[in-house]
Every structure is written in C-alpha cells, then in structure tokens.
From Swiss-Prot:
UniProt name for this protein: Protein TILLER ANGLE CONTROL 1
Keywords associated with the record: Growth regulation
Protein role: Involved in the regulation of axillary shoot growth angle. Promotes horizontal shoot growth.
Biased composition (Acidic residues): 99-115
C-alpha cells in the first residue's frame, strides 16, 4: 500500500505557509525518495534503465491508499503537519492575548458549537430531542385565562380553533354518515358545485325538482336552436338525423350534379334529348303555327 499512499500524498499537496516552508519541502522530498526506492526494490526494477526518466511519476491504478485494515491515524498521515501548524498558531495567539480575551473566545466557540447541530447526531439522538421538547412544553404551559393582546387590543381566536368550536365538526358528521351506509351519488356532487348551495337541501342523494326544471329548460333551448336551423323540425325526436340527410343531399348536388340529373331522368323513364332533336322540334312547331294562319283564296276548312 505504500505506492498508493505515495500517490495520495502527491495528489493532496497542501499550501506551505511562510514560517515552515523550507523544513516541510525537505521532509516531503525525503519521504518521496524513500517511498520510490522502496517500491522499486520490492518490484526488482532498480537497475532497469527505462525507469530512470519517470521514477517520480509512476502511474498507479487502485484505491488511492485507503486501507480498511489500518487505523484512521495511518490513513490521514498527510494531515499531521497541518494539524501541528494549526496548534502552534493557536498557542501563539493565546499567549499574545489577555486572559479575558481567551475566556471570550472559549465562550464564543462553545456557543457556536451549541448552535450548529451535527446531522449525524441529530438523526441518532432525535428521540431524545423530542422527549426534551415535550417535557419543556409540559413545564411551560400557557394558562387558560391568558388573553393575547397587540398594543392593548385583544386578539380574537381564529375560526375552527378549540376555543370557538363548541359544535361537532362537519367532517365528523360526514364520517358517521359514511359509516351508517349512506352513499354519495353524482347528484350530491353536482349540487355541491352549484353556487346557491345554501338554498338547496340534500335529501339522501335524490335530485331536487329545481334541478330537474333547470335541466328541462336547457334541453328545450337546445331544441329551439335546432328548429332555427331546420324550420320543418317541430317536435321531431331526431333532428340530428334530418340535419345529416340534408347535408348529404347538399354535398351530392354540389359535387356530382351530373349524376343526379341522370338518376332523375332514369327514374322518370325518359331520355335526355339531344341538341338536334330540340332544333327539329322547334321547326315542326313553327310550321304547324304557320299552317294554321288563314290564306287568301284558299277554301276554309270547317
């Protein structure tokens, strides 16, 4: 695991401070050289010429030096120097300051620790926090006769509070009705959506006569609209079918007028006359009209 620890140290190079720059750099270089030599001796590649150029940059693939068998102190070796420097700085500040300042700092640290809750501790000791809160509420209770005021004006309790509500809740009544076996129908739901719900009375899920009158008025108005479109429709039970028939006829006349004419003539048993026949008929009619005129010297036929 030395190679992994070495790579981990190289990855986490800390920022060196002013007073300890030279000593820390020397110690790091010495430890890195020792680790590389130990690794190369263990592998047996010390005398290989190919490794001379990249001994300091050996590529490693692994868990980056986290060994579960080792204690946590060995895993966090690269934090030792930082912790020592922080301790020295804190001691230096404490010697330079007064005793009162030390007391204030300690008090401030304790207050900050009290304010910030560790999430792990909160999850593990959540039941104890709840017990403390319940005991505190039991000790500090609001007396029954206290009246809350704002600038001398008493506050009225909100609707639905325990102080105002003396009658049983409507939800409790609904639950009791459901338990008795009464069903809620669609009529009840529709009546609940009506704006004047206060005027209507719910009678065991039955439709009220006022609602029936409103529905009848709506259906009559719909039939009146159909009568305006189709004047022949009076009290016919199927205005939609008649409308569909009318639309079919209109479409046939607009799209295929020739076919309709042919069908009409076939139904009458007559053929459509051609242009020549029409002209000949006109000439014959003219001759007949001329022959009927009186002629001088011709005998009159009685």
């Amino acid at each position: 695991m030395k190679i992994f620890n070495w790579v981990h140290k190289r990855l986490h190079q800390r920022v060196v401070k002013d007073g300890f720059a030279g000593n820390v750099k020397k110690s790091e270089l010495e430890t890195n050289d020792k680790d590389t030599q130990a690794f190369l001796k263990q592998v047996g590649l010390v005398n290989v010429d190919g490794l001379d150029g990249w001994r300091d940059g050996i590529l490693t693939i692994g868990t980056f030096g986290f060994d579960p068998l080792k204690p946590s102190t060995h895993q966090n070796e690269y934090f030792v120097l930082e912790s020592e420097e922080d301790d020295q700085e804190s001691h230096g500040f404490s010697h330079s300051g007064n005793d009162d300042d030390d007391d204030d700092d300690e008090h401030y640290d304790h207050s900050v620790e009290d304010e910030e809750l560790n999430p792990l501790m909160f999850t593990t000791f959540e039941h104890s926090f709840e017990d403390i809160g319940s005991n505190f509420d039991a000790i500090v209770q609001k007396p029954a006769d206290v009246i809350l005021t704002v600038d001398g004006v008493p506050l009225t309790p909100f609707e639905g509070s325990s102080e105002i509500s003396t009658k049983p809740d409507q939800s409790a009544n609904d639950q009791s009705k459901n338990k008795k076996g009464q069903r809620i129908t669609l009529a009840d739901l529709f009546q609940a959506d009506v704006p004047d719900v206060g005027q209507l009375k719910l009678d065991s899920g039955k439709v009220q006569p006022e609602m029936e009158k409103k529905m009848n008025a709506r259906t009559r108005s719909g039939l009146a609209f159909a009568k305006k479109l189709i004047p022949r429709v009076k009290d016919d039970s199927s205005p939609i079918k008649n409308m569909q028939r009318l639309m079919r006829r209109m479409l046939k006349r607009k799209i295929h007028p020739a076919e309709l004419e042919v069908k009409i003539h076939k139904s009458d048993g007559q053929k459509q006359p051609s242009a020549v026949e029409l002209i000949s008929n006109v000439e014959n009619d003219a001759y007949e009209s001329v022959s009927l005129l009186p002629i001088q010297g011709a005998p009159c036929v009685h």
